């Protein structure tokens, strides 16, 4: 085991806080309509320009191991918020920094960290309850477009494209974002999404996004388990000869079969991925039949008398693009016969009418939505590759924000909801003075996003926060784009309730862990690493 370095108490927290500030100060300059861009150097290709908080956070790795612990913990806030809400990562980072900074000051002043955390948790619960009570449902497509425009830093065209895509496939429909040429456009294609992802991370083709993307893809559908691919070798060779990529969908793919596919992918002989079939029992068989109709495949099943050794290339289904995450698979522009798909849809509709079971009806309606809904594809354009990448980041953030708004409604935006929800903490007391201090930490910290939005617009954040707090209206706030005060809802400045809620929950959770940390244990650099660090320091002098 390699040697470790240990830091205690104030020294440990001080080093962590320095790392927290380095990461948060880098990320928070992107917040709000007048937030600035960050340029990321890449190991290959052109630099990347972005205003996406989680993208910036993921790039930060500090050389000091103890500072890096703090930075990585706050990076976890951004990642968790992005995973749960899809947006609000910069807000979560700003909140985490504010809570951690105030909390560590209180610990340094001799307060009990555990009581501070109890006070923080109590205050957060009340603020979130208040945010929920302020929330109102999203109305029509125009309001969805407003949410989108705000998330896209005021670019109304992006908001309209998201609203248009949702109008075509439904608010719960599948919407995929891709790169294109000069113009951004939206198209609905035949496709389906199901809730099973890749069976091995070795199939991943885009490490940064942790996804598998297969183009011009052949699809093998198998009803049973695959444990060996010996009988499939001629088929695999035929797929390679046809210059196709391959998706294998089966009840399970394990043992030698999974190993064979992974090795083929890693050696570059065949671009391939495997996923479990969706559903359970009879539902799985029905879903596989839906997939077969949609992709034009023959379902390989002992009941149907088809065996792996007899499968030929023309028995596989096809899709122009397949995208797999760890949790889902999307088939885009699949090659099934339109008449067969329409017939299958009619069959499912008849089953919905005939069934008396509420559970069966729900499952049939899910299948119908998957088959009939299609996939909306937003193709993002721009004059240069750098512009396309930056624009795609914003479109993906916008899509996530609008989905969140549809799920839980919206609240006044621009940091106003947190400020007004914080008024519910007036008069709240803990069980002791240290818990009271934890409550005060949250009262101050929830002002941080509004302050930062104002600072990024070149206006004193303290003055702006003070004016918003003084106003009794729960919808009163600051429009950083126009540098005016007014009703946020009337101005169309709204945030998804889910994004605000999760940003605060995740920030308070991680900051609470940081405040209650007393010891950090880190890997001690080897001699070569120490010499390298000394050389870097020498070069800076």
UniProtKB/Swiss-Prot annotation:
Reactions this protein catalyses: ATP + H2O + a folded polypeptide = ADP + phosphate + an unfolded polypeptide
One GO process term, biological-process aspect: protein refolding
Cited InterPro entries: Chaperonin_Cpn60_CS, Cpn60/GroEL, Cpn60/GroEL/TCP-1, GroEL-like_apical_dom_sf, GROEL-like_equatorial_sf, TCP-1-like_intermed_sf
Compartment(s): Cytoplasm
CDD domains from the UniProt entry: GroEL
Tree of life domain: Bacteria
Keywords: ATP-binding, Chaperone, Cytoplasm, Isomerase, Nucleotide-binding
Subunit: Forms a cylinder of 14 subunits composed of two heptameric rings stacked back-to-back. Interacts with the co-chaperonin GroES.
Stated family: Belongs to the chaperonin (HSP60) family.
Record HAMAP family: CH60 (MF_00600)
Task performed by this protein: Together with its co-chaperonin GroES, plays an essential role in assisting protein folding. The GroEL-GroES system forms a nano-cage that allows encapsulation of the non-native substrate proteins and provides a physical environment optimized to promote and accelerate protein folding.
Protein name in UniProt: Chaperonin GroEL 2
Organism of this sequence: Cereibacter sphaeroides
Gene name of this polypeptide: groEL2
């Amino acid at each position: 085991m390699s040697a470790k370095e240990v830091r205690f108490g104030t020294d440990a927290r001080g080093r962590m806080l320095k790392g927290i500030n380095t990461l948060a100060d880098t990320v928070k300059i992107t917040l709000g309509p007048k937030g600035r861009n960050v340029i990321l150097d890449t190991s290959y290709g052109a630099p990347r320009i972005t205003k996406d908080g989680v993208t910036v956070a993921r790039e930060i790795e500090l050389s000091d191991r103890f500072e890096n612990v703090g930075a990585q913990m706050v990076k976890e806030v951004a990642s968790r918020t992005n995973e749960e809400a899809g947006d609000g990562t910069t807000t979560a980072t700003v909140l985490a920094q504010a809570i951690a900074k105030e909390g560590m000051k209180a610990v340094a002043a001799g307060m009990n960290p555990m009581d501070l955390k109890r006070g923080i948790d109590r205050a957060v619960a009340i603020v979130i309850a208040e945010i929920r009570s302020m929330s109102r449902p999203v109305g029509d497509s125009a309001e969805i477009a407003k949410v989108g425009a705000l998330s896209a830093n005021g670019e109304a065209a992006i908001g309209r494209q998201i609203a248009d895509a949702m109008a075509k496939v439904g608010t719960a429909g599948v919407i995929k974002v891709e790169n294109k040429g000069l113009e951004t456009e939206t198209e609905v294609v035949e496709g389906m999404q199901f809730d099973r992802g890749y069976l091995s991370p070795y199939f991943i083709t885009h490490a940064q996004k942790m996804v598998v993307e297969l183009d011009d893809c052949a699809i093998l559908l198998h009803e049973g388990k695959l444990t060996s691919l010996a009988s499939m070798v001629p088929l695999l060779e035929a797929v390679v000869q046809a210059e196709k990529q391959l998706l294998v969908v089966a009840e399970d793919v394990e043992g030698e079969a999974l190993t064979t596919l992974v090795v083929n992918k890693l050696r570059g002989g065949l671009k391939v991925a495997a996923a479990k079939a969706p559903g359970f029992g009879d539902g799985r068989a029905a879903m596989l039949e839906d997939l077969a109709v949609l992709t034009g495949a023959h379902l390989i099943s002992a009941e149907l008398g088809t065996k792996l050794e007899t499968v030929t290339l023309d028995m596989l289904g096809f899709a122009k693009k397949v995208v797999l995450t760890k949790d889902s698979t999307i088939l885009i522009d699949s090659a099934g016969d339109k008449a067969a798909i329409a017939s299958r849809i009619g069959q499912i509709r008849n089953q919905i009418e005939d069934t008396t079971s509420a559970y069966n009806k729900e499952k049939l309606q899910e299948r119908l939505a998957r088959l009939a809904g299609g996939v909306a594809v937003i193709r993002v354009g721009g004059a240069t590759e750098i512009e396309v990448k930056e624009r795609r980041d914003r479109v993906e953030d916008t899509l996530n924000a609008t989905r969140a708004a549809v799920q839980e409604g919206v609240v006044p935006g621009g940091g106003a909801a947190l400020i007004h929800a914080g008024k519910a903490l007036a008069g709240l007391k803990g069980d002791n003075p240290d818990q009271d201090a934890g409550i005060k930490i949250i009262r101050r910290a929830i002002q941080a996003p509004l302050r930062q939005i104002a600072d990024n617009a070149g206006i004193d954040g303290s003055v702006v926060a003070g004016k918003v707090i003084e106003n009794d209206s729960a919808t009163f706030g600051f429009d950083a784009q126009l540098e005016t005060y007014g009703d946020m809802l009337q101005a169309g400045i709204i945030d998804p309730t889910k994004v605000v809620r999760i940003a605060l929950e995740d920030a308070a959770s991680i900051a609470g862990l940081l405040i209650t940390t007393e010891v950090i244990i880190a890997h001690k650099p080897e001699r070569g690493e120490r010499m390298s660090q000394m050389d870097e320091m020498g070069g800076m002098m």
